Amino acid sequence: MDDVVAIRNAADTRPRLDLQEHLADLEAKGLLVRIDHPVDKDTELHPLVRLQFIGGIPESERRAFLFTNVVDATGRRYAIPVVVGAIAASAEIYSLGMRRAVGDIGAAWLAAIANPIPPVRVAAPQCQEIVVTGDALRAPEGGMKLFPVPISTPGFDSAPYLTATLCITRDPDSGIQNIGTYRAALKATDRLVVRMVARAGGAGGFLHWQKHKERKEPMPIAIVIGAAPVAMFTGAQKLAIDVDEIGVAGALAGRGVPIARCTTVDLDVPACSEIVIEGLIDTGKLEPEAPFGESNGYVALEAF
């Protein structure tokens, strides 16, 4: 049965709806470097990957990296691997995630935005095979401390950061969800600080936060780590505020994205997500968040 599934998946030329299948595609094409040697997430991991962007390496030689033996500065080993650069480290990697030639990607985006495909709800999602709640989240070595969250720019960043996220929120007035890629600083085993940029026109998540703040109520949020490339692409794309990105992701994929209802908040997430963090944002509280080393080569410093 597994062989039959593998053959069918290989023959399907549509974009993958499972990150694991996408990683297998990258590895098959020589676009994924697997590193089994111990790598320190606090001092080595991101600087190692960043060398291919600042070290004069041609874009055609850029690769995704899969770190299978992650440790921290204290020597702690993590059971969860870390993948970096698997979505858009190069035009070739992005093209593979879209399953389209580079020259066809722009037209594919326009068509997907104009013709979204609704998601498909599933009852027993992969992302809920293991659910951790309550006291287990607050255990000294439990909760999100089990995640090998890297320090992106050692010596500058104020905390370990989740960066390749899908932060999912819902407009309390219209009910339309938004998916945005916002960084999240790990502050405790059960607490993150999320930065939703108040850009021109307003980032969707930030506008939702404003509405919940006006209502004097917390804002439900789901943070997805490790989703299908088409979903990850929409999180970073600047779409109209009233557009539900998951429908655009479905159009890019050529079929509805499987989704599942969260276990503790009224939000839908991609069913094949590797990790989903569910929670509430306290709209009555702000915290200092920067500095943070940005992807385009500068350190963001903000006054609070």
Model-predicted segments: where are they?
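Extended, highly charged
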Residues: 2-304
